[in-house]
Each structure stands twice: as C-alpha cells, then as structure tokens.
A protein has these predicted regions:
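Glycine- and acidic
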Residues: 106-113, 139-146, 297-305, 365-371, ...
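Active-site cores that bind ATP or allylic diphosphates and position pyrophosphate for catalysis
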Residues: 190, 194-350, 359-360, 370, ...
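C-terminal accessory/binding modules appended to enzymatic or scaffolding proteins
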Residues: 38, 101, 437-582
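Proteolytic maturation boundary segments
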Residues: 51-59, 63-96, 436-467, 512-515, ...
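Residue-level signal for inorganic ion chemistry
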Residues: 127, 160, 191, 296, ...
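Structured alpha-helical segments in the cores of large, soluble enzyme domains
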Residues: 122-132, 156-157, 161-164, 280, ...
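Extended, domain-scale alpha-helical bundle/helix-rich regions
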Residues: 19, 23-39, 43-46, 363-455
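N-terminal Rossmann-like or analogous alpha/beta NTP/dinucleotide-binding catalytic cores
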Residues: 2-28, 34-219, 309-343, 352-357
C-alpha cells in the first residue's frame, strides 16, 4: 500500500466493521491491530496509523448505525458479501410440500419424564424456527401416556416449559396427552369399526409364536363389532395388565416383525403405577404411535421434525392414517446430536443422580449436557440456538465440540461481560512505592465499554495486595524477579515485598514481564471457582475483588482476568463461580 487514500480507506473499513459488531461504536484499540494484521509492512508507521485511526473512528461513531451499514456495503461490498455468505450457510433449507398446506404447523412433543438436553432442544428450536419463518403455528405437546415404563415426572412439565422459555421458544398452543385419553378412545372405536384394528387377547409370547409360523391372530379376521366389544371389555376392566392389547392392522409382509400389526393400546395397572396428573383414572393407555399420530392430525400438524430413530414409527403411523383416510404429515428425520465430553443420555443421567450419593447437584449440574446444565455453566440461549441452526436439519449424525459451542458463546458474552480480578491460592505482598507515595489508577470493567464502569484505586506503600502463588513463583524464577501488576506498575518481588521499579508499560514489554491480576487485600472476598472437566468438578479456592458492583453480577456472566469466563452464582456468605470456558 502506497497511497495515503488507500491507508485511510483500509482504516475506514475496519472501523466500520468494528462499529457494526459493537452496537455502532468502534474502538481505536480494536481497529489498529486489524489494520496492521492485514498489512504487516505498516508496523513502522504505527504511530501515524494510530493518529489517523483516532480521527476516522471518531467520524464513524458519529454516524447512525444505518449509515455505517450503508457505507460498508457501498465502499466495501466484498465484506458485506462475505457476511451474507456466512448467513446463507446458516439458513435453513425450505420445508417440503409447503405449497400444499394453507398454514405450516409444527410441534415439539417431549415426554415429560425428565428435563430436556441439547439433543432434545434441536427439534424444538428447528420446529419453532420453521413456524416463525413461514408465519405458521407452533405447538407444545406433552406426550405422557406411559405411566409405567417412561413414567412422567410431575415437576418435568414446568421444567420443560421453563427451559423452552429460556431458549426463546414461545408456543401458540399447548396440549397434555394424558388429559385427552377419551379422544383416543373415540378414534380407536372409529378405527375398529373401519376394520383397521383388532383386539389381541393372547400372551405376547403366543402372539410372537403365531407370527413366526406365518399365522395371524384369529380376531384379526373377526367382524368389527366383535373387536369393538372386546375393546369395551378392555376399558371396563375385564382384562388385567398384559392380558389384552389393541393392534393396528398393517402389511403382513414386513421382514421386521415389529412393524406388523403394532400395538395401539395396552392395559396398565395404574393402581400400582399412578399417573402424576390423572392418577388411576384410566387403565387402557394409547401407545406413542397411536396418540402421536392422532394428535398430529387433529391439531393440523403439517411438518414433524424428530430424530431418525422414529423412521420406523413413520412407517407404522402410515397404516393408521390410511385406515382413517387422513393425510399423513411430512416427516423430517434428524440424526443424533452429540455434545463431545458431555453426558446427555436421560437414562445415564438418572442413573448417575441415583447412585452418586449427592456428588451431582441435579439435572442442572454443569457436567451434564442438559439445557439446565449448560445454562448453569454460563452458556447462553443465543449460543445454543446458533449452533443448532448451524447444524441444521440433517439426517446424518452430528457431533458438536464444546470448543465450538464456547466460541459462539464467547461472541455473545465477551462484549458485555465485566472483567473481574480473581486470584487463586493467593500470596500476600506488601507494596513499596519507593518514597512512600501512592499510585492512583483507574481500571475499567470492560476495555471497550466505558458505560459498564471503572474502579478507582489508590495503592500506597504499606498496602497489602494478593497475587496468585503461580505468578509469585514464576516471578521469583526469573532473573530480576520482576512482574507487572496490571494497570498499576512494574514491581520486583523481594520475599513478601513488591518494590516499585517503574510505572511504564513499555518497560514491561521490553523486558517481557508477566502482566498479572491482583487484588487489594482490604477490598477482597474469599471465592470458590468450580471448574467442570468431564465427569469431574475441580474446586479452586482463591480471592476475588470485592467491588461495589460484585453483588450486581450474581447470576450473570463475568470474565475472570487471565482465567476465563464464568458465571457468578452467589455473593454471600461465600462468593461462588462456575467456570464456563476460556
């Protein structure tokens, strides 16, 4: 680059990009490294560039945000095109057969036997997003018709609602299947009378033997009236648990016998296995495939987004729709989604909680891949949504690294997280400023957001500060025993004294000194940082600065200087934090 105008133009480009990324306000300190990174040969002119950048950034910050975006698009179309290309990559593909429906209706249908995890959140987010894109309707439906095997938990209904709300998911209608059982009975009677179902009153073993011999149950060929009478007997309590089921007639030629004449209703002893909502009111319960298919039709669902483990269920449900003359919704099957190094299996988490003896706090433990666990760890709903939309609606299995999730989260929380000083395993040092003088310093809570505030500190000779033992030992291991106390000065460590050598930052840079965080002892609180690593929860004890704002940050993301991002969980009686990521 040789022309003066070219230099100003490249500074303008990075000033505009930085401003648009940060709410319309660019920072000189962020623009200069971008310019020098793109043109390393300009490093010798760093002072000149800094002066020009200050003026250009000032003019950019005076522009309305719309003007900034307009200027970037006009002057630097390649930058805008690159942004649009990245947005296009995250755009969801169109739903199939949309034009054949008056309105797009999607649903999320969890079993309330536990809280939801990242894998469950995928169909919820995608279904909600598609309904939003097509200005359609989104339904939340609790599928809780198995009080024996997949027993619903009374607390799970509200927990799932809370998790969905936190994720930014709002639903237009809500249904609970256990409150709709009479509707399923009505449809079952209709199905029987259309010749689409029969009552199997043999044992499971006898039925499987018949199938293996190529035979069918005698009731399959009986009149609808006969099977309806048997079904009414099921409802009246004539049969006990396991003595009779209602089966949907299917193609008998399937090699996979689980698809043949699948079970639509079974008897459950609800005196032994009461339902958390309806207790023992019903003993005949619809299976997942029956209740789900019926509700999808009655609720007008047009597109079902669910895991590919439901591929066979789509085949099963096809026969029910054909018997009743209903149109089957379009099914989109997703591959499994895994979050590397996290436990996501419901059954495994339940087992751990049962057997751990209190070592885990519950479904919200930050070592779990539950939505509550990720939230507890400081992962934002926006970051979860972003990675889900990036993965999209693919049938292939996908694995998300925590590093990728953390990268998305960092983009969201870095611009808003206050910086706090945390010192692990602290060593106490006495300050000596040479002539007994004091040093006044102003330390911003955020390097680019002055509105977040600053701390004003006055450090005098005789004051006691705390630094980490690791930083203390590192300084002593170096020739000269020097380090720089962040935003304060350069000090030589002599035993338990910190003796001022110089205030200039350039001195520290020339000598390659470590720039370390510190806490004024009289303005400190004991703190514990919990760091999840796989199935382990490491505890780090230390000291955190007791600023006037600390209490305000409870429940919020913060950045511990030179440690990483964390979420502040409690202020009193003890400051506790959970590590999020670097």
């Amino acid at each position: 680059m040789s022309e003066e105008g070219d230099l100003e133009k490249i500074i303008l480009k990075h000033a505009l990009i930085n401003a648009i990324k940060h709410g319309g306000k660019a920072q000189v300190g962020a623009v200069i490294p971008k310019v020098l990174g793109e043109y390393p040969e300009l490093r010798a002119r760093a002072k000149e560039i800094a002066e020009k950048a200050a003026k250009i950034v000032e003019s950019v910050n005076l522009m309305p945000k719309e003007k900034q975006e307009e200027t970037l698009k006009k002057e630097f179309p390649e930058v805008r095109l690159e942004q649009e290309r990245k947005e296009e990559q995250k755009k969801l593909p169109s739903l199939p057969e949309v034009e054949s429906f008056k309105i797009v209706v999607t649903r999320f249908a969890p079993n309330p036997d536990f809280v939801i995890h990242l894998g469950n959140a995928r169909p919820a987010i995608l279904s909600h997003e598609y309904a939003r894109i097509y200005k359609g309707k989104f339904i939340l439906r609790f599928e809780d018709t198995d009080p024996r095997i997949k027993t619903p938990l009374a607390e799970a209904y509200s927990q799932i609602r809370e998790d969905l709300n936190w994720l930014g998911i709002r639903w237009d209608e809500e249904y609970i299947q256990s409150l709709r059982v009479p509707i399923y009975y009505k449809v079952a009677r209709e199905l029987i009378m259309k010749g689409g179902a029969f009552v199997d009153d043999t044992s499971k073993e006898n039925y499987e033997e018949m199938l293996s011999r190529g035979e069918v149950h005698p009731n399959r060929e009986k009149a609808p009236e006969y099977n309806l009478e048997l079904f009414e007997k099921m409802l009246s309590g004539h049969y006990g648990e396991g003595e009779a089921v209602l089966r949907v007639k299917t193609d008998l030629s399937y090699s996979d016998k689980s698809l043949v004449d699948w079970v639509a209703f079974r008897i459950i002893d609800t005196d032994r296995y009461p339902h958390p909502i309806v207790g023992s009111r019903y003993i005949v319960w619809p299976t997942y495939n029956f209740a789900s298919a019926v509700d999808d039709y009655l609720m007008g669902v047009t597109h079902i987004i669910r895991g590919k483990e439901h591929l066979q269920n789509t085949i099963k449900q096809k026969h029910l729709y054909e018997h009743l003359g209903w149109r089957q919704p379009v099914a989109i099957h997703l591959g499994r989604l895994r979050l590397e190094e996290f436990i996501m299996s419901k059954s495994q988490i339940k087992k751990i909680l049962k057997e751990s003896g209190g070592a885990y706090s519950g479904p919200e433990d930050p070592r779990f891949g539950t939505i509550r666990g990720l939230r507890e760890r400081g992962i934002t709903a926006e970051a979860i949504r972003e990675v889900i939309l990036t993965v999209g609606a693919k049938q292939s299995d996908a694995s998300i690294s925590f590093a990728n999730l953390a990268a998305e989260n960092r983009k969201i929380i870095d611009p808003i997280s206050p910086r706090l000083m945390f010192v692990e395993n602290p060593v106490e040092l006495i300050i000596e400023n040479g002539d007994g003088s004091c040093i006044e310093t102003k330390i911003p809570y955020h390097p680019e957001k002055s509105e977040i505030g600053i701390r004003e500190l006055k450090i005098c000779s005789g004051d006691r500060i705390l630094i980490s033992k690791a930083d203390y030992d590192n300084a002593l291991s170096l020739k000269g025993g020097e380090l720089r106390l962040m935003e304060l000065g350069n000090y030589r460590i002599d035993g338990l004294k910190a003796i001022l050598v110089s205030k200039d930052l350039s001195y520290a840079r020339e000598k390659g000194l470590s720039i370390v965080q510190w806490v004024l002892k009289e303005n400190s609180r004991h703190a514990v940082l919990f760091m999840p690593e796989g199935e382990t929860l490491i505890t780090k004890s230390g000291t955190i600065e007791d600023t006037e704002k600390l209490k305000e940050y409870v429940g919020k993301n913060v950045q511990l200087v030179r440690v990483g991002f964390a979420i502040l969980k409690s202020f009193s009686p003890l400051v506790t934090l959970i590590f999020s990521h670097e």
